Amino acid sequence: MKHNPMVGEKLYIYTPCYDMWVSDVRRPYTVEAVNGNTITIREARPVFLGVCYYDTLPDYIEDDPNGARLKFRWSEKKQRWQESPAHSYPRVAVFGRWDWQPYLN
């Protein structure tokens, strides 16, 4: 079921790795803009986005002095918000679970 986020709403990002989910943020992102089936999210500071255990190199995003900004698009096929453009293991936006941070303290 599609979650229709609102500007200002918080979320976590997860990276599906084979059969496990790896948390790759230590605090929530915030929805900055909503445009149909695309959302733009922002972190308040430049961040390192986690890496699947099976990847060889970590996946960094640009060091934006205004904070990290990422775009996510709704996937009808997978019924989830995922990073756009998608990578091999596209990051997934998870709403309503801000206090759950598996593998990271």
Question: Where do the PLM segments sit?
Answer:
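Short coil-to-beta transition motif at edge beta-strands of beta-rich domains
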Residues: 2-22
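Exposed beta-strand and adjacent loop surfaces of beta-rich binding modules
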Residues: 8-10, 28, 38
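Residue-level signature for short turns and capping positions that connect secondary-structure elements
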Residues: 18, 46-47
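Residues that act as N-cap/strand-start positions at coil-to-secondary-structure junctions
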Residues: 23-26, 66
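Short beta-strand-centered aromatic/proline hotspots
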Residues: 25-34
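Generic beta-strand structural signal
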Residues: 33-36, 74
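Short, solvent-exposed secondary-structure boundary/capping segments
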Residues: 37-44
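Intrinsically disordered, low-complexity, charged/polar segments
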Residues: 47-105
